[in-house]
Amino acid sequence: MSTRHLVSICALIASTTLAAPVGAQGAPNVPKLQFEKITLPNGLEVILHEDHSTPIVVANTWYHVGSGDEKPGRTGFAHLFEHIMFMGSENVPTGQFDKLLEAAGADNNGSTTTDRTNYYEQLPSNALPLALWLDADRMGRLLPVMDQAKLDLQRDVVKNERRQRYDNVPYGRANETIVAALFPATHPYHWTTIGSMTDLSAASLEDVKEFFRTYYAPNNATLVIAGDFNRDSVVTWVNRYFGGIPRGPQMPARPVVPAFTVARDTFLVQEDKVTLPRLYKTWHSVKLFHPDDAALDVLADVLAGDKNSRLYKRLVFDMQVAQDVNAFQNSGMLDGYFQITVTPKPGQTPAKMAALVAEELEKIQRDGPTPRELARSLNTRRASFLDQLASVLGKADRLASYDYMAGTPDYAQQDLARYERVTAADVQRVANTYLKQHAVVLTVVPEGKRQLMVTGGAK
């Protein structure tokens, strides 16, 4: 809340509005997902959600391991296994995993974050037994056929991915530079999911196998089956294919995040093969589901969530000095950060962008957001929730995510309720609490243009 005296009726009304929750006028309107949760004797969590609207089913397996579980000197393993898991297993020859699914009309993929690795198949209902058998075989029978040739092949694939998505993409190395500067060397988010190519090159076959034995076990996984299926048949298949996989060792505790503060503003410059410079300002913030997490999301919406947001409207539309602007709260299970990025138009400088961003931050820190801005943010959040729950794959992903990260699959309504409870005072408070801290300020510049580096105005 502002500390200014309330010297008039208008000010009193304003302060009352500032304290009013965004969603005070209605309850969250997210549909409740019906599900059944079963835990096998080997520890595998199985979540079933029936949806018979279309003859489609999704099998979505989440392993509770991400790049944040790696150790310094052993980075990139979680993402490497995302690739290795498609190579084949004891009963599935090399190259046949995708071919079998393609023949069944399936769409399948995997992804890795700081906190988890997932694999999914979306396919016709009558092909579900195939997907479950394939997933079980790679969970329980991958190591016997894991050899040096497969490791070398997938290591090269990952290195090529790094070249394509990081090293040779405009601004592709920015995030790696930022997190390395923001988080201490012992912090599990100090590196990105792609990992260090030096670490991957040095990894032995036994190193990689040990990582699999530690984390790719049924007692460290959640399997969500969503869509058009018969419950009794699915339970039979799950027990048949997964029930015999031995329980793995006791899972290591999630890494302990070292307590730290960003002691000073850090100004960095990175030359890249880009036409326009780009400014990144990043503050240490909070982890997922922290009491301030939702308010920081709303703050990001107000600043640069859409074309009506403050920074976008002023810099892109009104002044026409920026190509684009973005803001977001990045919330991991262990920690988080808040970031604003601005790409100036030709002839404009990153330093000017930094000054304009600072002006807008001062305004919201002083006055907070308007009721209209809060309502717009909440409407966007509601629409996003409903959109994600409109598909079977979206439902499966939400159920797995909530089960692991919130402790229960039944969390969609509570999740949206966090945003319903955010007040203007909350947004103003988090803007002052986190965006007045020291920041990491990175300027990505065209090659030979280091003079464009921002060297002040981090707050």
Language model: regions and residue ranges:
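Short, glycine/charge-rich beta-strand/loop segments that flank catalytic centers
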Residues: 114-120, 148-160
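M16 family metallopeptidases and their MPP-like homologs
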Residues: 49, 54-72, 76-80, 94-141, ...
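Non-catalytic, conformational "gating/processing" segments within enzyme and secreted inhibitor domains
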Residues: 148, 155, 209-241, 439
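Proteolytic maturation boundary segments
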Residues: 9-13, 17-47, 230-271, 278, ...
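Active-site His/Glu-centered metal-binding helix of metallohydrolases
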Residues: 77-85, 299
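His/Glu-based metal-binding/catalytic segments typifying zinc-dependent metallopeptidases
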Residues: 163-168, 179-180, 250-308
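Positively charged n-region of N-terminal signal peptides that target proteins for export
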Residues: 1-5
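Catalytic Zn2+-binding segment of zinc metalloproteases
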Residues: 84-93
